[in-house]
Regions:
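C-terminal leucine-rich, beta-strand-based interaction scaffolds used for sensing/assembly
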Residues: 199-303
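Short, aromatic/basic amphipathic alpha-helical patches
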Residues: 44-48, 72-75, 98-106, 223-224, ...
């Protein structure tokens, strides 16, 4: 189990592990594990692969409600399959608290908590410097380390080294630039909703979002959305059905910036109307993380 806050490279570390072990193990990723009725089929599938000579390395990435039965799956695997496989799990701290379940019946589990250290920060700087990726404004690693030392987020540190500014500074600059544009207000509203949803671990239906925003602007909302994807402000799925933020850490910076004087509970309420029904449990599990008028919010939801 790789467990840490967003921005520490959990998924990258897990995928790197699968890559490094690909000569011995066959990599798999489990996307959904929320229905106990299907667990037996999953176990039977991997049992069949093992009988064919494979050694599966199964990734369960970013625990949430869609993967809530992972604990039961592990118990079934260890009783029915027993050997020649490994399971790799990544989770944010608060999601582990919500979805870990009873760990007493799991026979063997190692929990890794990656945290950027001072020594690693120096090594990363040297590696990036040798590759020519350090921004000219960055002269040495210690000053950059001191800027991120409170949270020690890997993503913040690497961004600072390679771009010469903090993510929050870049976000502030981008938002000011958007605000000067005639389509700024509708772009801000789109970013509020998409990034808030991203921080809550869900993505939004593109059709639902466009339908809700179209009446608020005289401009073509589809073209606005496309331009925002081209500017790497949001990410649209390959089939075009869903839209999400680029990364939870980046999305949180945008949410904080765009809600400095805008009620967060209003965005939270709007997201409840846009989220898919199957995402409700994930969405509402993250609401306690935010400071907003819960009484007003839940009153709007009920009414």
């Amino acid at each position: 189990v790789i467990k840490s806050s967003s921005g520490q490279g959990k998924t990258t570390l897990a995928l790197k592990t699968q890559y490094c072990l690909q000569n011995e193990y066959t990599p798999y990723q489990l996307i959904n594990c929320s229905d106990r009725g299907t667990l037996r089929h999953i176990v039977e599938y991997f049992h069949a692969r093992i009988r064919l000579g494979e050694k599966p390395l199964i990734l369960i990435d970013n625990l949430d409600a869609h993967l809530s039965e992972w604990n039961q799956l592990v118990q079934l695997m260890q009783s029915d399959v027993k050997y020649n496989y490994k399971i790799l799990i990544t989770s944010r701290e608060n999601d582990w608290y919500n979805y870990a379940g009873d760990l007493s019946n799991i026979h063997s589990m190692n929990i890794i908590k990656p945290m950027l250290s001072k020594e690693e920060a120096a090594a990363i700087f040297n590696t990036l410097q040798q590759a020519g990726h350090i921004h000219p404004k960055i002269k040495e690693w210690k000053h950059a380390w001191n800027q991120i030392a409170d949270k020690k987020l890997l993503i913040e540190y690497v961004y600072l080294l390679t771009h010469g500014e903090m993510i929050a500074e870049r976000i502030s600059s981008q938002m000011c630039e958007i605000g000067r544009n005639e389509t700024g207000s509708i772009k801000f509203e789109l970013l509020r909703q998409v990034c808030f949803a991203d921080v809550c671990g869900i993505r939004l239906s593109t059709k639902k979002l466009l339908r809700s925003l179209a009446p608020r602007t005289v401009y073509d909302i589809g073209q606005i959305l496309k331009s925002m994807a081209d500017e790497f402000l949001v990410h649209i799925s390959q089939d075009g059905d869903y839209i999400e933020g680029l990364h939870p850490v980046r999305s949180r910076h945008i949410v904080e910036y765009l809600h400095e004087y805008y009620p967060l509970e209003k965005t939270a309420y709007n997201i409840t109307k846009l989220a898919d029904l199957q995402d409700f449990s994930v969405l509402f599990s993250h609401y306690p993380e935010f400071s907003f008028d819960k009484v007003s919010f839940y009153s709007d939801v009920v009414n």
